[in-house]
Structure formats: C-alpha cells, structure tokens
C-alpha cells in the first residue's frame, strides 16, 4: 500500500507539474497569438504571475489543510490546476488568460500539497526520502516538459495546448481519490476544531530563510544562461540547452545513492553550489563549463537532500499543511526575487554577474544553516 501511495502522489505531482513548469517557456508564442499588441514586458509579468499567486496562497492553504485534511487539500490543488489550464485553453482575450493564470497559481500548489499529504503518511527517514522523490518528479517535469511541449508547438499548437494538457491534473485528481485520508483537525479534535493549531518549530524562520537563499542561488542564474553561454562562444542552442539541464540530470541520476547517506549533507551541498557559481562567474572559456555544471548539480542535489532531512525532522502531527505551505511559499518568493535580480545585475554588471550573486547567496545560506544541523537529531538513512 505504501508503494502504491507514494507512486500515486509522485505520478500525480509530475502530471500537474508537467504543464505548469513546461509551458511558460512558450508564453511569448502564446501571447503573440492571443494578444499580438501586448507590450513586451507583459511576458515577464505573465511568467511570474502564477508563482506570485502560489507564494501568497500557499500558507493559507496550508492552514486550511491542517484543519480540513491534507488529502483534501491535495485534491483541491489538482482540481485548481485543471480549472486554470482549461480556462486558459479557452481564453479569447488577454484578460481571460490572466484570470486563468491567477486561478492556476492561487488554487494550485501541488508541490506543497503533495509534501503535506506525504507528511501525514510517513515519518522521519521515510518522509525525508519521500520529499526527495517529489523534488525528483519536479526536476523530471522541468526537463521533459519543455522538450515534449516544444515538439507540440513545432506542429503549430499554441494556446490550445492548455486545453489538451488540462486533462493531466484531472487524471492526477482521479489517482489521489482512492488514497487513504488523513485525520483533519475538525475530526481529530471535534470539541476544539476552531481552536489554536499546533505550533510550528521555533527555528522555522531560519529554515525558511535558508530555503529562500538556496532557491535564490539556483534560480538567479537561469534566466540569462543562454546569453551567458553565447558570450563564452557556444553557438549551438542544443548544446546550451544540455548544459542548462545538466544540474537537473545530476539530481535525477544520483538521488537514489545520495539519499542513503546517513548524515546531513546540506552544508557540503551549499559549499559546492557556492564554488561552482564562483567558477562559472570567473570562466572566460566554454571548455570547463560541462564540469562546472555537474558540480552545480551535485551542490543542488546535496542541498535538497539536506533541506528535506531538516524539514522531515520538524514535521509534527497537525502542522504539516502550514509547514510545507510556508516552505513552498519561501521557494516561490525566492524564484520571483531571483528573476528580478537577474535582470537588474545582468544589465548593470555583465551577463555573468548572476553567478556571483548566486555564490554570495549560497555562502549566506551556509552561515545560517549550521544551527539547523546542530539542533536536529539524526534520522536513519
């Protein structure tokens, strides 16, 4: 039953994340068909709009999940994505499309909802590994989504892509329906259903700040990686795409072995991330880039595994929704801030400058993360 449960949650998350993470790359083409007179800056606004809505809504949905049930919240997330994608696919004007993106971001949030539900079914080491696998499904969607959707757009599909892909989160919804429900607060404690919820860990602000800096360090180098590669003399778009994807491929390939390690690898991961970004900032030739991207992937992998171990150690009965809601919101705010920062520093300090910013963010995360490891009890691998 446990294998079936985690397989259903992970596959459901992949199906929902496939469209959410894959289709934004093709927003310029979709917007050109839907609103050809829209200003260029509107692409950036539409790109971050669902993320901003999720960042704002995730803590509220987390609180709702703790009171009403995390499985119900997961069903809500898949249903919200289905509704948002379907409306986007039938949009006839820009206003309707914007509303669809707001619905997608506000009522979606499948990552936080999936992790919160898993936290009601697994504990300690089992939960830590489950969180690693939900991140695995996100990385897989991040790689496969743009490739497969690119093949579809090459056939002339545009806005109607949303219409067809809306059925993926609906399929995820159906897969979650037969899974066991957790015990929501209003059933577990009917005499005080509206009373105060169980408290979050006292060091939660520190954990959220480390998550913010870690996510920021990863994302800030994404937006301008193509012109960065071109500046190093790489003229092949496919090769730039491979180099861009390498860190995610490291996660997909090496996770089964790395997560068996008994100790927390968060600090080494942040250190590798800082070093790799510093070296990419100083690089003037393309030859070392392959090795440096692998090094970035190793840092990303160790960082995620370490963060998930810290998170699983702080998961408590009755607080999973808020814990993972705030954790996901922190990552979403980091992504938004990273996009803005990348645009500013690349225009003022050079196309490689986001890598220096990423290095500094990773170093700051290292300094803040040490107390998290000192206060955490070790959990079995």
Describe these PLM feature segments.
Residues 72-87, 265-279:
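Structural signature of the two symmetry-related core transmembrane helices
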Residues 52-56, 240-261:
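Transmembrane alpha-helices of Major Facilitator/SLC transporters
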Residues 101-138:
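Cytoplasmic helix-loop-helix junction between adjacent transmembrane helices
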Residues 110-122, 302-316:
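Intracellular juxtamembrane helix-capping segments at the cytosolic ends
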Residues 1-3, 181-211:
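Juxtamembrane intracellular "pre-TM" segments in multi-pass secondary transporters
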Residues 161-178, 354-371:
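Symmetry-related core transmembrane helices of the 12-TM Major Facilitator Superfamily/SLC fold
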Residues 2-48, 204-206, 210, 214-233, ...:
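Helix-loop boundary and gating motifs at the non-cytosolic
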Residues 319-349:
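A late C-terminal transmembrane helix in Major Facilitator Superfamily
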């Amino acid at each position: 039953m446990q294998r079936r449960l985690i397989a259903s949650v992970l596959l459901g998350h992949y199906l929902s994340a496939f469209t959410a993470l894959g289709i934004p790359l093709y927003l310029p083409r979709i917007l050109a068909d839907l609103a050809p007179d829209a200003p260029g800056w509107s692409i950036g606004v539409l790109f971050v709009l669902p993320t901003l809505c999720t960042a704002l809504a995730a803590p509220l949905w987390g609180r709702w999940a703790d009171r009403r049930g995390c499985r119900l919240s997961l069903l809500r997330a898949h249903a919200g994505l289905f509704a948002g994608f379907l409306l986007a696919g039938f949009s006839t004007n820009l206003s309707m499309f914007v509303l669809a993106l707001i619905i997608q971001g506000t009522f979606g949030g499948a990552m936080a909802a999936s992790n919160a539900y898993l936290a009601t079914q697994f504990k300690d080491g089992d939960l830590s590994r489950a969180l690693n696998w939900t991140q695995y499904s996100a990385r897989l969607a991040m790689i496969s989504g743009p490739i497969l959707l690119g093949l579809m757009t090459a056939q002339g599909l545009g806005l109607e892509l949303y219409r067809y892909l809306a059925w993926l989160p609906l399929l995820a919804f159906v897969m979650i329906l037969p899974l066991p429900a957790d015990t929501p607060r209003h059933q577990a404690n009917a005499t005080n259903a509206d009373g105060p919820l169980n408290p979050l860990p006292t060091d939660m602000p520190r954990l959220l700040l480390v998550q913010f800096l870690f996510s920021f360090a990863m994302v800030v180098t994404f937006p301008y990686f193509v012109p960065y590669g071109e500046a190093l003399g790489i003229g092949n778009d496919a090769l730039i795409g491979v180099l861009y994807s390498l860190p995610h491929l490291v996660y997909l390939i090496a996770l089964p072995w790395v997560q068996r390690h008994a100790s927390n690898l968060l600090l080494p991961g942040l250190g590798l991330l800082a070093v790799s970004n510093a070296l990419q900032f100083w690089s003037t030739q393309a030859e070392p880039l392959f090795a440096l991207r692998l090094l970035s992937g190793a840092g990303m992998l160790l960082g995620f595994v370490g963060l998930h171990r810290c998170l699983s150690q702080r998961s408590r009965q009755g607080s999973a929704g808020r814990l993972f809601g705030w954790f996901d919101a922190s990552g979403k705010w980091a992504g938004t801030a990273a996009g803005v920062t990348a645009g500013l520093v690349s225009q003022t300090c050079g196309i490689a400058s986001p890598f220096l910013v990423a290095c500094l963010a990773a170093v700051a995360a290292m300094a803040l993360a040490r107390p998290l490891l000192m206060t955490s009890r070790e959990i079995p691998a």
